[in-house]
Amino acid sequence: VVEAPVSNKNLVVEPCRSDFLVAIVPPGHPKANQETVNFAEIMEYPFICREEGSGTREVILDHVCHAEGCEDGLNVTMELGSPEAVKGAVEANMGISVVSRASIAKELKLGTLVAIDLDPPLERPFSFVHQKQKFRHRAMDELLEFARSYCKSHPEAV
């Protein structure tokens, strides 16, 4: 499963669903009571992001460059190697971040993070990717069928 566009002729890309990105802040943050936030507002705060090469980071930076202009950019104060590390830094009030809504279900339930919808919304496709092959393994076909079925029966989950 990948969250970025794939342009390799030797691969088959099957869309699964859209993933919506949201801003996250700790509960006491000045933006915590807002329903929506735009990137111009996010740029006012320290920004915590994933490491270079991360699909999430690329989507965010591409969006900021097109919407707000790269010359201003985000005030990146930390680059971390996992979604869990990003969420932990935001919970510790070290800055704001933008993550997949699906990745913060536990934190929202526990009340350790607040999700704020982005304006305009920012979404990315989640797709299954596999090699084009004349001869495919049965196990791979069964896994793909299971994943397709799961996506259809759980539209809210990723």
Where are the predicted features?
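Small-molecule pocket liners
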Residues: L11-V13, S18-A23, P27-H29, V37-F39, ...
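Structured beta->alpha junctions
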Residues: P5, E52, M78, D119-P120, ...
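Short beta-strand-centered segments that line the small-molecule binding cleft or hinge
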Residues: V1-L21, V25, N33, E91-M94, ...
